[in-house]
């Protein structure tokens, strides 16, 4: 587990603007719509990364990270990836998980839903 946590942490350091990573392959996810699970909301810093990774291992095997300029913190989330054609399902999932936005990886844009 420590090796996986360290690997994701290192990946976040070389991707300071954000990333979406399949933690089984350690390869970036470049297509689809990323939606965070509520259970890992407000996870920031390396100390929260273990919890995020544990959740991801039990669910979608994908972790997202992004830097919030308002709080000056790097956040991590366990995320679920939907096909772009499943945008309605992704939005419903996001609402059920109290998310303010989803991220379109294919077009590199945030989609606000609230």
Functional labels for PLM-detected ranges:
Residues 1-114:
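Conserved, structured core segments of small domains
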């Amino acid at each position: 587990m420590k090796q996986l946590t360290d690997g994701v942490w290192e990946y976040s350091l070389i991707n300071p603007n954000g990333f979406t990573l399949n933690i089984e392959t350690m390869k970036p996810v470049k297509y689809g719509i990323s939606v965070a699970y509520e259970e890992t909301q407000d996870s920031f810093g390396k100390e929260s990364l273990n919890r995020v990774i544990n959740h991801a291992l039990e669910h979608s095997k994908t972790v997202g990270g992004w830097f919030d300029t308002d709080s000056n913190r790097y956040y991590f989330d366990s995320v679920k990836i939907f096909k772009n054609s499943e945008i309605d399902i992704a939005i419903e999932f996001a609402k059920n998980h109290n998310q303010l936005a989803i991220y379109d990886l294919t077009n590199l844009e945030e989609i606000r839903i609230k």
